[in-house]
Regions:
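Conserved catalytic submotifs in the C-terminal HATPase_c
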Residues: 11-16, 33, 38-48
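Helix-loop junction within the histidine kinase core
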Residues: 1-12
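Short alpha-helical Gxxx[C/S/T] motif in the catalytic ATP-binding
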Residues: 125, 129
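Short conserved segment of the HATPase_c
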Residues: 100-112, 152
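Short helix-loop "hinge" at the ATP-lid/N-box region of the Bergerat-fold HATPase_c
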Residues: 68-69
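A conserved beta-strand-to-alpha-helix junction within the catalytic ATP-binding
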Residues: 11-26, 58
């Protein structure tokens, strides 16, 4: 695909990170299936702006949140971000879902990988996210414990001094 070949154009601009996160959570609050899952944004995250492709950031976060909603039947899903070394923003979607077995975590970003054949989807979402994140100069990963939940994360370059 164009994304995997690095042939996709990025439309860069200044992005108010907390505002973007609030917008994404508001959108997903309307898509939530039941009230047993709380969807929230961690408001303790710092007020920053980044030079990024807003739509691509939303695309990755939306994929993470869609997956979290599929696999979390009760508890919470939290969108947060942190500054790392004043040069990276680390976005994270943490859920209290069923988690991913250790032996399957390394495969999850491969194309056509679906860990649950009963769940709708082609198994391309995380592979596309990985390509987009790499194209934007970041890294992507997951930290998960089976039966406890997962944290899907990605990093994006940050230039210090761009606080709001």
């Amino acid at each position: 695909s164009k994304i995997e070949a690095g042939a996709i154009d990025l439309t860069m601009g200044w992005v108010d990170v907390p505002q973007l996160c609030r917008e994404v959570i508001a959108t997903f609050s309307h898509k939530k299936r039941d009230d047993a899952v709380e969807l929230r944004f961690d408001e303790s995250s710092p007020q920053i702006v980044i030079n990024a492709d807003k739509n691509r950031i939303i695309q990755v976060l939306s994929n993470f949140l869609t997956n979290a909603l599929k696999f979390t039947t009760k508890g919470s899903i939290t969108l947060s971000y942190t500054l790392e070394d004043e040069s990276l923003v680390r976005f994270c979607v943490t859920d209290t879902g069923k988690g991913i077995p250790d032996e399957q975590q390394h495969e999850i970003f491969n194309r056509f990988i679906k860990l649950d054949s009963f769940v709708q989807g082609a198994g391309l979402g995380l592979s596309i996210c990985q390509s987009l994140v790499k194209r934007m100069g970041g890294e992507i990963g997951v930290e998960s414990r089976e039966g406890e939940g997962s944290c899907f994360w990605f990093t994006h370059p940050y230039v210090s001094g761009t606080f709001l």
